[in-house]
Amino acid sequence: MRLKAIKTGLRNALPLLYRFNPAGLRFALRVVIAALIAYGLARLLALPFGYWTVITAVIVMQGNIGGSLKAARERFIGTALGAGLGFLVTLIPVGPDYQWVRLALAIGASAYVVSLDARFRVAPITAIITLIVPQPGVSALAAALDRVVEILIGGAIGVLVALTVLPERAHRSLVKRIAALLRQLSGMLAIDMKGLHEPRDDAALSELIETSRDLIKTSVTLAEESSGERAARLTGGTAPDALVRTARRVRVNLIMIARATREPWPPEADRQLGAIFDNLGRSVAAHLSAQADALEAGRAIAPADGWEESFQRFEEGMAAFRANKENDALPTELMSRIFSLAFAVRQVKADLADLDDRIGEFAGTPRG
């Protein structure tokens, strides 16, 4: 039993040993190639602190081209800022016993800049290295310039390798994430609609909600990186931010539906509205899956036949439900859930129409 527990622990701690990940292997290859090129160039040019070139090439190498461009830009700007501040404080006349004053001023100034913009977070580290690390006889200005040049070389190597060695574009990764998100939302809706008639699987629903939240977070980062690719003219098409925002709105409304379907309806409500919402739920779930397929295929999408009819039947059913005076005896909490569900359904329809437009804008955009 103990051996089995150890094996399970290793499996949980080292999942890569139990799962083949082609994207991970491609990334590892890019990192190795970038590091070896940087190492060889540092040796060839006899750079004084050549290890910074290698480290930068590795740090800049991200999962996609957009991420590498962003990392290279931020590291170079932060390094230049920190090196500049490190050099400027050396101009302050202090005695040998008060070198800490320069160090404190450089760290404080660079840390303040980081508080304004986290993209410059390497600035304090560079300022410290500029003031402390230089070899005897090497001026602070020379140390600062050396570090900036080496970071620039390492960043350039990382970007070039990202562009040429099994390149992965943030745009393509974003499309995959949004498609996966839409399929997760389709599964969420299926569980929600089932919850109108019988106790639902809340554990499975919670897992889908958590997974969809992670996909949204990843998509926000990928959208930023994809925008960097567009700025560098590596990817065409429209800006991806609107696609992510619209997908997020759809998710929020589906969570509202999940809250409104947390308990089965009593027989009198289920008899009047159950079949209507079942039909509507199947239509929306199918459309979410179709949107995912269209996004991955790079084509526009139109609602399936019967789409508008299912919403028309929904509106007619809700109107009949409101007009039925016998429903005034239903519990207030139940009525609140029913009308909250109806509101969320209308919002979903509007957001899905917007999402159709966003997917249409992405149609034909090169996937990289």
Regions found by a protein language model. Give the residues of each.
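Short, charged/polar, low-complexity loop and linker segments
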Residues: K194-R200, E225-T235, A323-M335
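Soluble C-terminal extramembrane regulatory/interaction domains of multi-pass membrane proteins
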Residues: T246-G368
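Alpha-helical segments in soluble extracytoplasmic regions
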Residues: A203, L208-S219, A275-A285, S289
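Amphipathic alpha-helical coiled-coil segments and their boundaries
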Residues: L174, L205, G236-A239, L243, ...
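A transmembrane helix-and-boundary motif of multi-pass membrane transporters/channels
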Residues: M1-D214, D357
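Short, surface-exposed loop/turn segments at secondary-structure junctions
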Residues: P199-S206, R230-G237, P267-R271
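Oxyanion-binding "anion nests"
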Residues: L215-M256
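Membrane-helix exit/interface motif
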Residues: L88-I92, S227, A258-R262
